[in-house]
């Protein structure tokens, strides 16, 4: 039986996705390669989303365990101003 592949972490998945997008944006990939890259990009996106959802769940659980701590939403406009 082949050894199990160790899943790559979020940062590696995100870096791979960014590199893939950059390659595709150059516009010089053959159609078949573009389709394979797109499929890989979808898989990487789903993996990143799943990891983010798991991290959010873990943070929420930790906050709830601490008691009356209020959660505030992330303000993208405020972050962009930094």
From Swiss-Prot:
Main location, first listed in the record: cytoplasm
Lineage: superkingdom: Bacteria
Enzyme class: hydrolase
SUPFAM superfamilies: XseB-like
Pfam family, one: Exonuc_VII_S
Keywords recorded for this protein, A-Z: Cytoplasm, Exonuclease, Hydrolase, Nuclease
Function in brief: Bidirectionally degrades single-stranded DNA into large acid-insoluble oligonucleotides, which are then degraded further into small acid-soluble oligonucleotides.
Subunit structure of this chain's protein: Heterooligomer composed of large and small subunits.
Protein name listed in UniProt: Exodeoxyribonuclease 7 small subunit
Top-level taxonomy: Bacteria, Pseudomonadati, Pseudomonadota, Gammaproteobacteria, Cellvibrionales
């Amino acid at each position: 039986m082949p050894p199990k592949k160790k899943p790559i972490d979020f940062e590696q998945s995100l870096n791979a996705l960014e590199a893939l997008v950059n390659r595709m944006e150059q516009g010089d990939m053959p159609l078949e390669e573009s389709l394979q890259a797109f499929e890989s990009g979808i898989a990487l996106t789903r993996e990143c989303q799943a990891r983010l959802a798991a991290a959010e769940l873990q943070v929420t659980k930790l906050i709830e365990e601490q008691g009356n701590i209020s959660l505030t939403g992330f303000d993208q406009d405020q972050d962009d101003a930094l």
